[in-house]
Amino acid sequence: AVLIFFFVSLILLIGSLFYFNTQKNNVEKTLDISDNIDRIYSKQTELDYYSWKIFDKVVKQGISKGEFVNGLRSELEFYKDVEKGYAVRELEFLERQLVVENVEVSDDKIVLKLNFNLYTDSFGEGLVIDYSYNRELVKEF
């Protein structure tokens, strides 16, 4: 009876250690995914800033509805120095997916409507991010 009790206890101990280790790994994986999501959403403020930065360039190029912003890579070139590997992928996404929906010009202001859609699972772990960014920027004279 003591021997059976010992083996049952040993099996339960090994099982519980395996279970808690699996739970710990799942929590760490969830935290990694959360960090990646936070990183994408934190880019919204930066996108606002850089949208203003390219405002004049976009208007000067005469980009109309539905056209992609040409030369966005050069506008954000410094990203490569700050976050090398991540930046290259992000630049490619931005260059392909930031669209000028419309440009309205009147005597006293210019209105630039931007749309940015990111749909990617490039962060691994089967995570799919579907992120939309829409802004209407107004520059008054």
Task: List PLM regions with ranges.
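Glycine-centered recognition micro-motifs in short, flexible terminal segments and loops
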Residues: 1-10
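Long, compositionally biased, intrinsically disordered regions
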Residues: 12-141
